[in-house]
Amino acid sequence: MQYEDKNGVNEPSRRRLLKGIGALALAGSCPVAHAQKTQSAPGTLSPVARNEKQPFYGEHQAGILTPQQAAMMLVAFDVLASDKADLERLFRLLTQRFAFLTQGGAAPETPNPRLPPLDSGILGGYIAPDNLTITLSVGHSLFDERFGLAPQMPKKLQKMTRFPNDSLDAALCHGDVLLQICANTQDTVIHALRDIIKHTPDLLSVRWKREGFISDHAARSKGKETPINLLGFKDGTANPDSQNDKLMQKVVWVTADQQEPAWTIGGSYQAVRLIQFRVEFWDRTPLKEQQTIFGRDKQTGAPLGMQHEHDVPDYASDPEGKGIALDSHIRLANPRTAESESSLMLRRGYSYSLGVTNSGQLDMGLLFVCYQHDLEKGFLTVQKRLNGEALEEYVKPIGGGYFFALPGVKDANDYLGSALLRV
């Protein structure tokens, strides 16, 4: 069911404003309430935070360089479109929904109560932008024979295959398209997903879904504080500076000199890995061994033998690995050689917690997400270096896939994937 919406943020309705004025009047009659009226209730965001928004139009999609929000969801879909025209309809529709949801506005009213409501209603009558980003990526399978797109497939895009330590569940792998939905709060993420599914019943079918989180204080630091994963270590310390445009052109974005299809310029290769942690086993492992495995101090995040989280380890002066073990995670992931400079990538991972496994173990771990201009030089090269690392005893990749994050939407007349479908 279609309806018209506005991309700009609308003010709450008159009724809601009057209700708010009435509540303030009651609060003013109570000295304690009056003294605390500028504070947000525990566990809630301030009105300013709820109205934070990221720009939707631009050369690149939001949600890649955007400082990590507190809540995240990965949703892979199978595309039900029957031909290229249907696929264009899907991408245009997704663009319209993303534009509205990320900028906020009044929830649509349902003209006929005998019909299903036009909105789920879980955010109330006003849909605050809440720092929402929705990033659309396409998988290897979208370039099969259905839509005639095979000649336009990104050169390095491929189906994810098993690494030695993987225990992949087919139900948690791959997808024609992937949505990365992030916001300040989980309810905004869920609302966005339900809106998208409601508008695409004949075009998309959910393949798998996982929800993630980082701490509120890490999210509110706008990238200045490194999130801590569920093994208790800082996750993403060695990330390249996402505010350095020149560096991001080198590390994250596909550029014109890469001999890729022209439509891919401004996009990025995305690797997704759903990694289960053996947290009970980890929690019984001595601290010294944990730190040796990672190569970092658990509390400060500093490389072993150093003082601060962002101190750069000097492996050349420690060739035998007496300070930082040769098979430590940080040393294998980034040996800091001239050759390893080409395998830099931007990580954007989140923790997850799902309950218990069939064996009665806690089901929690990491939703690993990274972006790079070249999948083979980036994630695949790094993962090959990590094969056999000591950390493998405590982690088990169970799903994910490789995708290509589409370039951004130029303006209101453009749509996601337009350059791909116009070829």
UniProtKB/Swiss-Prot annotation:
Mainly resides where? periplasm
**Keywords tagged on the record:** Heme, Iron, Lyase, Metal-binding, Oxidoreductase, Periplasm, Peroxidase, Signal
Q: Which InterPro entries match?
A: Dimeric_a/b-barrel (IPR011008), Dyp_perox_C (IPR048328), Dyp_perox_N (IPR048327), Dyp_peroxidase (IPR006314), EfeB/EfeN (IPR006313), TAT_signal (IPR006311)
* Cofactor binding comment, as recorded: Binds 1 heme b (iron(II)-protoporphyrin IX) group non-covalently per subunit.
Q: Which GO terms describe its biological process?
A: iron import into cell
Q: What is the effect of changing Q68W?
A: Loss of deferrochelatase activity
Provide GO CC annotations from the record.
Answer: cytosol; periplasmic space
Report the NCBIfam families cross-referenced here: Dyp_perox_fam (TIGR01413), tat_substr_1 (TIGR01412)
Task: Say what the protein does.
Answer: Involved in the recovery of exogenous heme iron. Extracts iron from heme while preserving the protoporphyrin ring intact. Also displays peroxidase activity on guaiacol and catechol in vitro. The deferrochelatase activity appears to be closely related to the peroxidation activity, but the link is unclear.
Q: What is this protein called?
A: Deferrochelatase
**Source species:** Escherichia coli O157:H7
